[in-house]
Structure formats: C-alpha cells, structure tokens
C-alpha cells in the first residue's frame, strides 16, 4: 500500500507558521527602525532573505518528492507560504501598530515633511503641501489599513518571487554513491 504523504497545503500550513514569525520580525523592524536605526539593516536582511527561506521549503519539498514535484506545485507551495505567513504576520503587526505605535503613519509622514522641508528645492513642492494637508485633516491610513495594504503587497510580491524560487528549487538532486 502506498504511503500517504502530506499535501503541499498541509506542508504550507505547518511551514507557514515559522515563516510568518520571520515576516513578523521584518515587520516589527520596519515599524521601529526610526527609533533604533540598526533595525533598518536587520529589516533589509530579513526582506532580502525571505526568498531564500521560501526556496529552502520548496527545495525540501522537491527532495521529499524524490525530484518529481512539478514547478506548479512548488510555486503553489511558495504562494501558500507567503499567504499563510503574511496572515500571521499581519495579525501580529496590527496588534503591534495598534497598541505599540498607533501614530506610526503620522510619525512617518511628519518625518518625511521635515526632511523634504529641509531641502530648498522641495520645500514648496506639491508633495509636501499634499502630505501636510493629509496630516492636518487626519487622512492618513489607520493601523488596520496600513497592515491590510502591506498584506496585499507582500502576498503579491511573494507570488512573483515564488515562481522564480520554484525554478531554482527544481535543480537536479545529487545522487549518492
């Protein structure tokens, strides 16, 4: 009788938890990097490393399937990892922003206004005027809107990235003597 192997969806649900925690670390670093500048470097490392983490899981699945996993299956695994990981990270990030830094969007906007106002060519630009008006009239996104937009951005980017990492994960398995 054939051994029942877990599907890519089952694997993604298990592997999506550590990946979601990984994405959460990147999100926390992005929210607090203006308070602690070395977090900007950590954030960049985590963002650039996320395709490597997905590649690791895709490659692991490919090897477990003895090299018979198709590109579409590996791509779907990557998509599901990003989807499930981003759901977990989004929930945690909402709590972090809502209760840890509820004025995050306004802090960032005020920082941008200050930086652009210090540049003589940009001081009276339309961008600065519009951003000042948005801050004054409280039109910047709420924490849930910020997290929701980040969810779609990471998920879409992850879908594209997963296609590339799936190609790389399908390289030949080395034969053992």
Identify the role of each PLM range.
Residues 18, 22-30, 50, 85-93, ...:
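Alpha-helical transmembrane segments of multipass membrane proteins
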Residues 133-159:
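Individual transmembrane alpha-helix segments
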Residues 1-5, 169-177:
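Short, charged juxtamembrane terminal tails flanking transmembrane helices
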Residues 92-120:
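Functional transmembrane-helix hotspots
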Residues 75-103:
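Juxtamembrane "helix-exit" motif at the C-terminal end of transmembrane alpha-helices
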Residues 116-142:
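Short membrane-interface loop/juxtamembrane segments of multi-pass integral membrane proteins
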Residues 1-62:
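Transmembrane alpha-helical insertion/packing segments
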Residues 58-74, 98:
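Membrane-helix interface/capping segments
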């Amino acid at each position: 009788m054939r051994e029942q192997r877990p599907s890519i969806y089952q694997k993604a649900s298990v592997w999506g938890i550590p990946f979601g925690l990984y994405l959460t670390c990147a999100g926390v670093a992005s929210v607090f990097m203006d308070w602690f500048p070395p977090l900007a470097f950590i954030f960049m490392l985590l963002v650039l490393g996320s395709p490597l983490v997905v590649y690791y899981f895709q490659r692991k699945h490919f090897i477990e399937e003895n090299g018979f996993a198709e590109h579409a299956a590996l791509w779907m695994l990557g998509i599901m990892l990003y989807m499930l990981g981003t759901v977990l990270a989004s929930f945690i990030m909402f709590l972090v922003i809502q209760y840890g830094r509820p004025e995050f969007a306004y802090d960032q906007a005020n920082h941008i206004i200050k930086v652009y106002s210090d540049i003589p060519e940009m001081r009276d630009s339309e961008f600065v005027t519009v951003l000042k008006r948005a801050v004054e009239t409280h039109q910047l996104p709420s924490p849930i809107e910020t997290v929701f937009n980040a969810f779609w951005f990471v998920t879409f980017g992850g879908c594209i990235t997963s296609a590339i990492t799936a190609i790389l994960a399908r390289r030949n398995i080395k034969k053992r003597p």
